[in-house]
Design a protein with these regions (language model features):
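Ankyrin-repeat C-terminal turn/loop position
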Residues: 38, 70-71
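Conserved ankyrin/ankyrin-like repeat signature
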Residues: 28-29, 61-62
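Non-catalytic interaction/regulatory modules that flank or connect domains
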Residues: 84-165
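Conserved small/polar residues in nucleotide/adenosyl-binding loops
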Residues: 179-180
């Protein structure tokens, strides 16, 4: 089954073959898998699809190719606004994700010097232990297994340490200091 995506020892996130090909920046393999019927709309445990993996990897050629094949409404701003309404995002957070800067710098920090956020259109829905959340962060300096998440339940930013399965609140968006 080309779209097999059950968690196992090799791929615990329940990703598909085409998602893994995108993760490894293998455009010829992505094309071949799609020609064989791979479904690029299947998200893994953390909400990643081949397109979002290409965005994370800054692989514009692959992202453009996959975007053209995804449902058009997934890349329509009005549809994204409608889709994210249940998450009760603060207007300031929405504006920030639309206008940036998406790279947050922490020069005074020793271990984490930066974090890069998704643009508004690329924010990902995900579920963690039956909680509906939004994944806001593409990547973070030195920590590949952390996610920055938005919880609509308490309207706070949370972080998830995937490796240790630790899920902790950080702050309300208004309490985050950032320069615009």
């Amino acid at each position: 089954d080309i779209n097999y995506h059950k968690p196992d020892m090799v791929f615990p996130n329940a990703s598909t073959a085409v998602t893994e090909a995108a993760r490894h920046k293998n455009l010829p393999m992505v094309r071949w898998l799609i020609e064989q019927g791979a479904d690029i709309t299947i998200a893994d445990k953390y909400g990643d699809r081949p397109y979002t993996v290409a965005v994370q990897n800054k692989n514009q050629e692959l992202a453009d190719y996959l975007k053209a094949l995804e449902p058009e409404e997934w890349h329509n701003e009005q549809e994204k606004v409608r889709q994210l309404m249940p998450y009760k995002l603060p207007a300031k957070l929405v504006e920030y994700l639309k206008t940036g800067p998406l790279r947050l710098e922490f020069p005074e920090r020793e271990l984490v010097k930066w974090a890069e956020l998704y643009s508004f259109m690329d924010v990902q829905e995900m579920t963690w232990k039956r909680k509906k959340l939004l994944s806001l962060m593409v990547q973070m300096d030195n920590y590949s297994d952390y996610l920055l998440l938005w919880s609509p339940r308490d309207k706070k930013l949370w972080y998830l340490d995937i490796e240790h399965e630790e899920f902790h609140p950080l702050a309300k968006w208004d309490a985050v200091s950032y320069t615009h």
